[in-house]
């Protein structure tokens, strides 16, 4: 299944039918497709109008905003939803969504309004959250802590002897890419690494892409859409 086929599949499904675990891949896939169409307007014939894609991103942002405010959501999942909602704002500029995301972010990293930033987890999603906080507030400490997480990840890879799940590696790739784009550090071999991950994606998930597992479908959608945009 290529990007066009997968795009048709996910676009035919109402946003509310996707499980929370599928929203991040779905959002990033649509952001990449939006960027593709913005650069190449004639591809609206393939992917629909920029407005249509924009509306899907808005709907995903609405789901994320609800999840962020749901007390039953675990802390690590909430961190991921906050990071995604702030990234959605970069395409769909709704200040209400940004306010929800920033309030929730600082409620986690600066509880009770403390001056010191604390990190309850050091996940790729936390790295993206910190990058967005730096982008929107200019708080240097957020950039420093995001950099520390990226460096720790490099050390962890060097010392790791056990293979980690592919989904986790993709989440780290996304975090590293976002860090490089926002903080502006030296770029790594991003396209090469992405293509290597794409090959592994299809080895592991290719046989399940036509299944009803929407989390798998949106992961592959994210991967294919980013590849297509990176090769423009």
Q: What kind of region is each of these model predictions?
A:
Residues 2-5, 52-59, 103:
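Helix-turn-helix repeat elements of alpha-solenoid scaffolds
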Residues 58-76:
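Blade-loop segments of beta-propeller domains
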Residues 20-38, 43, 59, 77-90:
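Non-membrane alpha-helical segments in proteins
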Residues 104-115:
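Asp-box/WD-like beta-propeller blade repeats and closely related beta-sheet repeat scaffolds
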């Amino acid at each position: 299944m290529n990007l066009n086929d997968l795009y048709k599949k996910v676009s035919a499904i109402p946003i509310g039918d996707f499980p929370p675990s599928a929203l991040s891949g779905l959002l990033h896939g649509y952001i990449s497709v939006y960027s593709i169409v913005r650069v190449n307007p004639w591809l609206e014939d393939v992917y629909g109008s920029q407005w249509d894609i924009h509306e899907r991103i808005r709907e995903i942002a609405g789901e994320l905003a609800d999840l962020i405010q749901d007390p039953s959501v675990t802390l690590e999942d909430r961190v991921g939803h906050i990071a995604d909602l702030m990234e959605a704002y970069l395409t769909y500029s709704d200040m209400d969504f940004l306010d929800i995301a920033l309030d929730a972010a600082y409620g986690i990293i600066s509880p009770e309004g403390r001056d010191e930033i604390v990190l309850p987890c050091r996940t790729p999603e936390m790295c993206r959250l910190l990058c967005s906080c730096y982008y929107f507030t200019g708080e240097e400490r957020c950039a420093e802590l995001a950099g520390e997480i990226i460096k720790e990840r490099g050390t962890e890879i060097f010392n790791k002897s056990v293979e980690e799940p592919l989904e986790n590696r993709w989440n780290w790739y996304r975090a590293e890419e976002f860090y490089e784009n926002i903080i502006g550090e030296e770029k790594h071999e991003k396209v090469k690494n992405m293509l290597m991950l794409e090959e592994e994606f299809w080895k592991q998930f290719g046989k399940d892409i036509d299944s009803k597992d929407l989390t798998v479908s949106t992961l592959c959608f994210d991967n294919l859409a980013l590849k297509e945009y990176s090769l423009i």
